[in-house]
Amino acid sequence: MTLQFRADVDLRPYNTFGMAVRAAHFCQLDDAADLPALLAHPLYRQGPVLWLGGGSNLLLTRDYPGLVVKVALAGIRLLREDGDDMIVEAAAGENWHGFVQHALAQGWYGLENLSLIPGTVGASPVQNIGAYGVEVKDRLLEVVCAQLDRNGEAATLSNAECRFGYRDSVFKHEAAGRLLVTAVRFRLSRRAELRTGYGDIQQQLQADGVDRPTPLDVSRAVVAIRQSKLPDPAVLGNAGSFFKNPVVPAEQAAALLERHPQLPRYPAADGKVKLAAGWLIDQCGLKGYRDGDAGVHDRQALVLVNHGRATGEQMRALARKVQQTVKEKFGVELEPEPLIL
């Protein structure tokens, strides 16, 4: 397919916050074979360039002065079977939840806890998306990339080479702007290995009358939980969890626990402790807070929402207010999850 470039494009349909900003130039990448032509195009070469997936982890505060490329690569295929394991490849532009549901329908298990996470397959390793005790790295085999500095030549990164961390990967650091994710390969399983340890999941399964859950039951429970807590971006603009759960030294967590005995906490790597950002924000009295059309969601304090006409700058100002308030009360720094431009 020939690439089509458009000028002065409204980006509201392409970002889940619904920010009314415009791109100087825009094109959609439907076929990886078009990458060399895209990389050679004057609009790409003069830059800047923003690669866009689902636009669900992005806060746009101003018009974008360069080229926005919407990655719409599609396709899901079973590469091979390895005993009970199924090696499955999904193209970067596939909707994440759609892919999870397709996998479940085929009897390929392991991603059910990650149901209904917004965004695309291509963004999943960048952010190392996670929920309810599972991260994408747990099932990811390798990532297929295009090398942007080598005319789009393909490269494959192993799980280890992706250097996954909490909501982090090599794609946010050395590989940023150099590697474009074009497909992700997963090691899924015919055997169910359910992760139902989170209280919310147990309660939802109980409410659903499920005693012996299947992976599909777990997926349905996760979907029900997320729908009950998180606003639909089609109705109320948002980017899901706006802040990462902070990870602090054990001594700091212990000191906080003395002052706040109800403090939710979870073990993290290197003896550190992960805190619940939503709880910290809630304890500051900010759940449901609103400044104009920029607000903190009234059911999940971790989510910032656009009530209609908030600008990106207003959303950023609200985020800073939340960060400052939490820092003053708890001495804890909150780090935003979305890319802010």
From Swiss-Prot:
Name assigned to this protein: UDP-N-acetylenolpyruvoylglucosamine reductase
Subcellular compartments: Cytoplasm
GO BP: any one term: peptidoglycan biosynthetic process
FAD-binding PCMH-type domain mapped to chain residues: 19-191
Catalytic activity: UDP-N-acetyl-alpha-D-muramate + NADP(+) = UDP-N-acetyl-3-O-(1-carboxyvinyl)-alpha-D-glucosamine + NADPH + H(+)
Record-linked InterPro entries: FAD-bd_PCMH (IPR016166), FAD-bd_PCMH-like_sf (IPR036318), FAD-bd_PCMH_sub1 (IPR016167), FAD-bd_PCMH_sub2 (IPR016169), MurB (IPR003170), MurB_C (IPR011601), MurB_C_sf (IPR036635), Oxid_FAD_bind_N (IPR006094)
Keyword Zinc-finger: no
Domain of life, per lineage: Bacteria
Presence of keyword Transcription regulation: no
Top EC class for this record: oxidoreductase
Keywords attached to this entry: Cell cycle, Cell division, Cell shape, Cell wall biogenesis/degradation, Cytoplasm, FAD, Flavoprotein, NADP, Oxidoreductase, Peptidoglycan synthesis
Similarity comment: Belongs to the MurB family.
Single GO cellular component term: cytosol
Active site: 167, 241, 337
Pfam families: FAD_binding_4, MurB_C
Known function: Cell wall formation.
EC number in record: 1.3.1.98
Names of required cofactors: FAD
Pathway: Cell wall biogenesis; peptidoglycan biosynthesis
